[in-house]
Amino acid sequence: MTPEGEAIIRYTLRNDSGAEVQLTNYGAAIVSVKMPDREGRIADVVLGYKHPEGYFFDGAASGKSVGRCANRIAFGQMTVEGKEYRLEVNNGVNHLHGGTKNFANRIWESRVETNRVVMSLVSEDGDQGYPGELCVEAVFDFDDDNALEITYLARTDKTTVVNLTNHVYFNLAGEGSGSVLDHELRLNSSKILEMNERQIPTGKLLDAAGTPQDFREFRSFRPGISSEFNHIRDFKGYDHPFVVDGWKPNILGEVGTLREPRSGRSVTVLSSQPSVMIYTGNWLAGGCPETKSGGRYADYDGVATVSYTHLRAHETLRHL
């Protein structure tokens, strides 16, 4: 139960290979993904907490569906169709992830449809300062090829800002196994968005070639984290939006692959969105509740690959 007395429901999606995904209606969250290594050994490969209450307003938003707007809005101010809106400032001088009571910290309505779980909520006009009533669905499918598909659907009656995503952290060596800095990443991206000192995009595109942010071929995170490259050093690690090469609206395309050499596990990310945020868990230490493995996470114990849009009145957003 939540502190407000709302029921928390856990769902398990299991396939014929023995892999499984566990979800909860609190934050439309992924709380466990169990998948085999190259020897067939099953391990949980996403971060999470030992007790349900650990998910209540956790700063890491571990595994949860974030909105209305994932990431930061400078000074909590935005202009939509010529009108200025003020939002909660909850991250230094910025608005982050839709505010304190964002979608990650709410109970979603939930139901089972055949072999998938559908979760939904309604965000009223003015919720957290945003214009328009917003109706949201998150659909979770898991098949026998170990493919987990998350589809976000959103519809509004006023033009608004919507940026929905799932904030799952992977550790493909297994949850609780330590640092992910030796994981290897390949991205279909040759450019990144420049960020200012407040981690707000400036609108300028930077070439990744020749820098520690060039992941067009597999490379681990460790050399970049250890470098003096200012775009990484200033944020204590990777916390940057990478622009997807060849992106086309509403087309599901391959963004990249994360792999862990020792176990042989890998995750290939596909998305219909124009960019992906890579975050190496730079601030996990000290801020997380007791973990599933009974300890506390250190910085860099998980990596999030977060796909990141204006939604106009009476349009429907479909985000895969």
Predicted regions and their residues:
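Extended, loop-rich substrate-binding clefts of extracytoplasmic carbohydrate-active enzymes
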Residues: 1-7, 12-16, 84, 88-145
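Beta-strand-rich N-terminal accessory domains
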Residues: 1-49, 68-70, 74-85, 271
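Active-site/ligand-binding surface loops and adjacent short beta/alpha elements
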Residues: 176-261, 266
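Active-site loop/turn microenvironments that scaffold catalytic and metal-binding pockets
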Residues: 43-103, 200-201, 205-207, 213-215
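Acidic (Asp/Glu-rich), glycine- and aromatic
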Residues: 151-180
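Short, well-ordered beta-strand segments enriched in hydrophobic/aromatic residues
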Residues: 11-13, 23, 140, 148-156
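Acidic/His-leaning functional-site neighborhoods
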Residues: 98-103, 108, 245, 251-308
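Conserved small/polar residues in nucleotide/adenosyl-binding loops
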Residues: 309-319
